């Protein structure tokens, strides 16, 4: 099973675009999620996750969320690879949102 649930805040406004061929909505944003524990100096630790949403969910997220807003995201992890202009291969792990709860 590939399932992840995160609650965090958007680090910047949602980027909404539409694919060229099928005109499908795609939203992308970064979610800052605080860890439950702190460092020894009581400083909070935060993880940052790249999140992608598709179709109507993408449009709703773009409409109702902006920088600093809190959201709960349920989805799956997905790996993606690409080559840059210099031919260097890159890999990334993204969260593919399946549900969003606006908090």
Regions found by a protein language model. Give the residues of each.
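Single-stranded nucleic acid-binding surfaces, predominantly the OB-fold ssDNA-binding core
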Residues: 1-103
């Amino acid at each position: 099973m590939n399932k992840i649930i995160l609650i965090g805040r958007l680090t910047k406004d949602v980027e909404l675009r539409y694919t060229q061929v099928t005109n499908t909505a795609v939203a992308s944003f970064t979610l800052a999620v605080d860890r439950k524990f702190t460092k020894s100096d009581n400083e909070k630790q935060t993880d940052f996750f790249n999140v992608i949403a598709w179709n109507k969910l993408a449009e709703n997220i773009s409409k109702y969320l902006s920088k600093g807003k809190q959201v709960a995201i349920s989805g799956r992890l997905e790996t993606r690879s690409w080559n840059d202009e210099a031919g260097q291969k890159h890999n990334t792990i993204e969260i593919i949102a399946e549900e969003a709860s606006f908090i």
